[in-house]
Structure formats: structure tokens, C-alpha cells
């Protein structure tokens, strides 16, 4: 088993559970503040080796992955990984289905506009698709 594992349907998710899946959509939750991050990760990376024409398939760093958000990474560094739970929300067989489901959930969960009781953002996510930004939404309201 690996440190602070991913959970899927109340069970620890391991390599043998990957089967034919290409990637997953996940939620990382800060147990101290309840702040969340929704993202996606692929199980595989495809790289062209020097001097080769074909791409080779390699397992990605999905077991160690904690998202790409700088604010989330900073909180993990400050509080420690043990204060964050990692849940796989859905598994997908293609890159396109993985990306679509991530985007759908980001909008459905209102990650750019949802606030905690204290008025701070409920999600670490600060943008969707690099096109829609939390800061733009709140500027619009003021």
C-alpha cells in the first residue's frame, strides 16, 4: 500500500483496480477547514523516448499526486498530508471522458462561487479550463 491512499466507493484504490481505466476525477478535502479541490488525473503517461518513433506507456505518479493548485500544495506542506483525504469520484476509460467529467463537476459544484460559512472560498479551485476565474466572478458582483 502507499501513503494516504486514494479511496473509491469506501475502499482503498490500488494498481490492480485500474483495469482498463484511463483516468479519474477526484476530490481532495482539507480535514481542518473542509476546503476541497476537484481535479482529474490520468493513470498513464505517454512519452516518446529519444531516438524512438513510438510513444511508450508508463504508469503516472497518480499514487503520490495531490493536485496542481499552488494554494492546496502550500496547505499540504504546512499541515501535512495526513490532514487531507483523497477520494476518487469517478473512473473513465478515455482522456475525453475524464476531461469532460472534471469540467462538468467543476461547474455543478460551483467551485468558483461557493463560499464557506466564514465567507472564504469553499474550494481551492480558482479557475475552470483556464477561462473562467473566481476573481472575475467576484469583480463582476462588486
Question: What would you call each of these model-derived segments?
Answer:
Residues 1-142:
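Structure-specific nucleic-acid interaction/processing domains
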Amino acid at each position: 500500500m502507499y501513503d494516504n491512499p486514494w479511496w473509491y466507493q469506501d475502499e482503498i484504490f490500488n494498481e490492480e483496480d485500474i483495469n482498463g481505466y484511463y483516468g479519474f476525477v477526484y476530490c481532495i478535502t482539507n480535514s481542518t477547514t473542509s476546503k476541497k479541490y476537484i481535479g482529474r488525473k490520468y493513470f498513464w503517461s505517454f512519452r516518446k523516448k529519444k531516438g524512438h518513433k513510438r510513444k511508450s506507456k508508463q504508469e503516472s505518479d497518480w499514487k503520490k499526486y495531490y493536485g496542481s493548485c499552488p494554494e492546496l500544495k502550500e496547505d499540504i506542506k504546512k499541515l501535512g498530508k495526513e490532514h487531507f483525504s483523497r477520494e476518487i469520484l469517478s473512473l473513465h476509460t478515455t482522456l475525453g471522458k475524464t476531461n469532460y467529467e472534471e469540467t462538468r463537476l467543476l461547474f455543478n459544484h460551483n467551485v468558483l462561487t461557493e463560499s464557506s460559512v466564514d465567507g472564504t472560498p469553499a474550494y481551492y479551485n480558482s479557475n475552470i479550463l483556464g477561462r473562467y476565474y473566481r476573481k472575475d466572478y467576484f469583480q463582476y458582483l462588486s
